[in-house]
Amino acid sequence: MSTNKDKIEQSLALLEEVRKDTGQNPIHNYQYREIMHREVLKQYLPTIERSVGGHGADAVTSTLKNIELKSSTWDRKSDPTIDTWKPIMFDMSKLKDSTKIYDYQALGHGLWTRTGAYPIANFFIGPNHIKKLHPLFKKLVDEYDTNTGRQDTTFTIKDILNYMDKQDIIWFKNGQRVRGV
């Protein structure tokens, strides 16, 4: 019978193989989610790859240099819907952090179960539509309070849909492109 120590060592050995393949430690700050998010997005963005460095863009393509990929944990048994989709969180603890959202050329968000490699659902807003979110970003930045410490701000897919049509968003379910959630 395997002990917890044995299971962890086996897991860490496999995770080290992923680190060697991707250049990212998959368990640091949920990096495995970025790795798998990029893998799913290759259906739509064949040249997507990891951006170099731990700050700034999460991914790049041959034409996009600032793709932001966000993730959340999905603990429900049911599939996510527009109404139940988890909020997207941004750290706005520094003013420069709060304004860098205007520089995003694309935005993705995925929902992961605690044991799933692929997101059970994710979406991607590309360069033709991301600027439609600037009024939402302005609202978030205007609410920024420089006197507090770490300040997270969230918005939902319903908030996004106040600024763009559902068909402006690329949707995926269990790693496959779909028409919507």
Predicted regions and their residues:
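Nucleic-acid endonuclease domains
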Residues: 1-181
